[in-house]
Amino acid sequence: MGNGTEEDYNFVFKVVLIGESGVGKTNLLSRFTRNEFSHDSRTTIGVEFSTRTVMLGTAAVKAQIWDTAGLERYRAITSAYYRGAVGALLVFDLTKHQTYAVVERWLKELYDHAEATIVVMLVGNKSDLSQAREVPTEEARMFAENNGLLFLETSALDSTNVELAFETVLKEIFAKVSKQRQNSIRTNAITLGSAQAGQEPGPGEKRACCISL
């Protein structure tokens, strides 16, 4: 998966980061989009997002990654945060079992507000702190399998699997969009309009703000 330019892209995929406060969502975001990591644990209140354009085959995909930035502490996340999301990383801290114990609640909230076709990856973050592990890998992997989720363990600190996590989710979304587009072409059921899933803009056309699965 290569980098593209921010101005030149075929698709925009909105991906949301969800999970308890302090699990490392913001650092996963900054590591993927800017290759940065902050040891400052202070929480920023509000919703923020960063983007990174990557190449999937010959298609340029702009990943728009949204972070709750502390709002989860106050249960203040609204349906607007999930609207239009085609991917999600459900993050827990593998050194704090209580952050894993509530992933089912987060998953329910996600499915209550997002499309059923959303691509979801369960992410056990802070794998660099293996000595302090409280969540066995196989336990989390089994939960992911039983719920139809992708699964990886990551470390935003040392970058382990961060690229792979986002890349895997983006590739899965792209595969779904491509399949939907092919099916639409075969059935001659493409709806004209920039918001149609899988439709690439023509020359001079304004690019779609998001893709819906």
From Swiss-Prot:
Regulated by guanine nucleotide exchange factors (GEFs) which promote the exchange of bound GDP for free GTP. Regulated by GTPase activating proteins (GAPs) which increase the GTP hydrolysis activity. Inhibited by GDP dissociation inhibitors (GDIs) which prevent Rab-GDP dissociation. Its cofactor is Mg(2+). It is found in: Cell membrane; Cytoplasmic vesicle; Cell projection, Pseudopodium membrane. It is an enzyme of class 3 (hydrolase). Mg(2+) binds at residues 26, 44, 67. It is a lipid-anchor. Interacts (GTP-bound form) with RAB11FIP1, RAB11FIP2, RAB11FIP3 and RAB11FIP4. Interacts (via the hypervariable C-terminal region) with ITGB1 (via the cytoplasmic region); the interaction is GTP-dependent. Interacts with ITGAV. Associates with the integrin alpha-V/beta-1 heterodimer. Interacts with VPS33B. Switch 1, switch 2 and the interswitch regions are characteristic of Rab GTPases and mediate the interactions with Rab downstream effectors. The switch regions undergo conformational changes upon nucleotide binding which drive interaction with specific sets of effector proteins, with most effectors only binding to GTP-bound Rab. This is Ras-related protein Rab-25. It comes from Homo sapiens. The lineage of its organism: Eukaryota, Metazoa, Chordata, Craniata, Vertebrata.
